[in-house]
Design a protein with these regions (language model features):
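Pre-Walker A (Motif I) flank of P-loop NTPase domains
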Residues: 1-2
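Hydrophobic anchor at the beta1->P-loop junction of P-loop NTPases
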Residues: 5
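The conserved Walker
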Residues: 9
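Conserved lysine of the Walker
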Residues: 13
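Short loop/turn segments at strand-loop or loop-helix junctions that form parts
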Residues: 32-34, 75-78, 115-119
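Glycine-rich phosphate-binding loop used to anchor ATP phosphates in small-molecule kinases
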Residues: 52-107
C-alpha cells in the first residue's frame, strides 16, 4: 500500500521518510522531484514556470510508477504540486493537475494519506523555500484541497518518534 505524506515545505516529510527507512530497510521511500529539478533549473536557466511544469509532469509519472510498490512512503503527491502551482499563480498548471487528479483514478486508489502540519521552524537547506508566509499559504491551500477532494488524512504531530508511532497505529 502507498503511504503519502502531504504538507507544506519544511514540515518534516523527508526527515520522516529517512527515519522510517532506518527502522525498516524493506520500506521504499520516494522524495519529491523538486530538489533535482531546482538543481537542473540552476544549471539550465529554466524559468519558474518551466520548473513547475517539469515538477508537475514528473510527479504524475512518479505517482503512476510507484503504484505497485508495497510498503512505500512518498514525500510528495500530485495534490502538493497542484497546490504549489496555484499558490504561485500558475493557474493553467494547477488546473491541469486538478484535471489529472480527478481523471487518473488517484482519488479511488487505496492510499494512506498523512498530513503534516507546520510545527517546526524552516531550515535553509539551500533548496527549500524559506519564506514563512509562503509556507503558511501552501498549508492553508493544502487543507482546502484535502476538503475539495474529500481525502481522508491522518494528521501526524510531534517529534519524529511520535509521528512514527502514529503511523504504526494506522498500518
Amino acid at each position: 500500500m502507498r503511504n503519502v505524506f502531504i504538507g507544506s515545505h519544511g514540515t518534516g516529510k523527508t526527515t520522516l521518510c529517512k527515519a522510517l527507512k532506518k527502522l525498516d530497510s524493506s520500506i521504499a521511500i520516494r522524495d519529491g522531484v523538486s530538489r533535482p529539478v531546482k538543481i537542473a533549473r540552476d544549471k539550465t536557466g529554466m524559468t519558474p514556470y518551466q520548473e513547475q511544469a517539469v515538477i508537475n509532469e514528473l510527479t504524475k509519472f512518479y505517482w503512476e510508477y510507484n503504484k505497485d510498490f508495497d510498503n512505500i512512503f512518498l514525500a510528495r503527491s500530485p495534490l502538493d504540486v497542484e497546490v504549489y502551482s496555484r499558490v504561485f499563480g500558475m493557474v493553467d498548471l494547477a488546473d491541469d493537475m486538478e484535471n489529472w487528479i480527478r481523471t487518473s483514478g488517484m482519488l479511488n486508489e487505496d492510499v494512506n494519506y498523512f498530513y503534516l502540519p507546520i510545527e517546526f521552524e524552516l531550515e535553509d537547506d539551500g533548496v527549500r523555500f524559506v519564506d514563512v508566509e509562503l509556507q503558511k499559504k501552501v498549508d492553508e491551500e493544502l487543507q482546502k484541497s484535502i476538503k475539495k477532494y474529500n481525502i481522508k488524512v491522518t494528521k501526524l504531530t510531534g517529534s519524529v518518534e511520535d509521528r512514527i508511532k502514529q503511523i504504526h497505529r494506522t498500518q
